[in-house]
Design a protein with these regions (language model features):
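Glycan-processing catalytic domains of CAZymes
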Residues: 1-272
Length: 272
């Protein structure tokens, strides 16, 4: 059975303000412009993610002692306190930097993640190995794969790298692949997974993917039929700057209090 996972961003309130603009968002979350460290916000998000039928969450991570790192600990602890079955893993963002980290830097980060989080009951594991999703950039290629496999020899995480041209031809392969390109409504990376997005409207720009609830319903139904994949991925729960959230916003409120996009996920579970 495929794991239904959603990308999550624990970087607020910092990122409500960007490039001198507040709020740096086109939509209005029903919780307001919240603080990601607020336990009540985290509890509400956990309930919403559970309502959407998700098995786990891929949480943006920007390095040791970053806001996202400190909030990740809060996410794990609050999940346990709520007796939630949700599992969390890290989305390693620095691989997308103009100058990505080298193998030694990655190895150090993986050692930290393993020591700090991997044994937590709410951290995601596959085949008894802690899961790490890795972002990428236009420079990602064969050398990136080689670097990550070298860097992970000691810690042995379950690595899910971001795709690039001819990624299947790499002589060395990670455990799985994913795509993160939320301006596309559906991306098929079988047999690893399928990624769907509700829309993409970056603040200050024209929409690159206009929201269409009927199209979202069709894509969620299609996803539900693909149970033999490794992952069903959704971009995103709350990346407001790029206009990809599925969390409840004033623009799509519903009687469930969860919003139209989560309602569709709630009512369309994977077919076994």
């Amino acid at each position: 059975m495929a794991l239904r996972l959603v990308f999550y961003y624990p970087w607020f309130p910092r990122n409500w303000t960007q490039l001198g603009s507040f709020p740096y968002a086109n939509y209005h979350p029903t919780q307001g412009y919240y603080d990601s460290a607020d336990t009540n916000v985290i509890k509400t998000h956990i309930r919403s993610i559970e309502y959407g039928g998700f098995d786990g969450v891929i949480s943006s991570w920007w390095g040791i002692k970053s806001d996202e790192d400190q909030n990740f600990q809060r996410l794990l602890e609050t999940t346990v306190s709520q007796s939630s079955p949700l599992k969390w893993c890290i989305y390693y963002e620095h691989e997308g930097d103009p100058t990505p980290p080298n193998a030694d830097q990655i190895a150090g980060d993986l050692a930290y993640i393993q020591k700090q989080y991997a044994d937590h009951p709410s951290y995601m594991k596959i085949d008894d190995r802690f899961v790490v999703f890795v972002y990428g950039s236009h420079t990602t290629g064969l050398d990136t794969v080689k670097k990550w496999i070298e860097a992970s020899k000691k810690t042995k995480p379950y690595l899910v790298l971001k795709v690039f041209s001819n990624y299947r031809s790499c002589p060395q392969q990670p455990d799985a692949w994913h795509e993160y390109a939320p301006a596309n409504p559906l991306i098929d990376q079988s047999p690893d997974g399928v990624t769907i997005s509700p829309g993409f409207w970056k603040y200050g720009e024209q929409p690159r993917l206009t929201r269409d609830l009927a199209a979202w319903q069709r894509n969620v139904r299609l996803l539900a039929k693909r149970s033999k994949l490794k992952f069903h991925l959704v971009t995103t729960f709350n990346e407001h700057g790029e206009g990809t959230p599925i969390e409840s916003c004033k623009e799509w409120q519903t009687p469930s209090l969860q919003g139209s996009y989560l309602d569709v996920l709630h009512n369309t579970r994977p077919i076994t």
